[in-house]
Amino acid sequence: KEENILFELIQTVDAMTYDQIQQFLTKFLGCSENVPKYIIHNLIRMRAIEATQEDEEGYITCGNSGFQTNANINTDVIYALYYLLDKAKTLDEVLSLVPSNMNNVALSFILNGEYYEATYVSLDEMYKIDMIRKRYENDCLDAEYQKDEVIPFRSVFMFGVKTDEEEREILDKFEKMNLQIPHSIVIFHSKNPITKPNYTEFSIE
C-alpha cells in the first residue's frame, strides 16, 4: 500500500528528493526510519521509479519519464513540496496537491480548508507577484459579485538565497510593495534543494 501511494505521488509531482520521500513515508504513512530506503529500492527494482544519480544526491522520478538528470528537474515544485510536507497535518492535505505551470504557480494545495498557491520567485521575477495580486483582486471581485465570502487563495512566495543580504533585499522589496493580499514569504537558505534546506517564513494575513 505504501509503495502504491508513494508511486502515485511521484507520478503527480514528477520528481521527489530522498529527504521528501523519507518525510512523507514516516510522517504520513507511519513507516519506521529504515523503511523508505527499502521501498525506494523495491520500486527501482520494479522499474516503477528511477534515480537521476546512484547516491542520494539525485532525484527520484517515474520509471517511464525518460532519462532525466538533476539539471532538468523542476525545482520550483521541489521547493513547494518541502513547504507542503512541513505544513500538512494529514495525508489528505498532501494528496490535495496539484502541480501547475499556469499563472506562475508551481503547486496548489489545501491546508486546514484553505486553498494555497505556491510560486517560486527570483529577485528579477518580482513582476510575478504583481500579476498574482491582480488575479487575486479580480477573483475577489468575482466572489463579491456572486456573494461568496471565501478568500480565493493564499499565496506562498518562495525564494532561494545564499546570503543574508539577498534575504534583506527580498524583504525590503516586499515592504515597498505593501502587498495587501493574504500571503507568506518563504525564504529557503539554499539554491540547491536536493537536500532539505532550512527556510524562514513570514506570514501576512
PLM feature spans:
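Generic detector of well-ordered alpha-helical segments enriched in charged/polar residues
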Residues: F7, K37, Y82, R168-D172
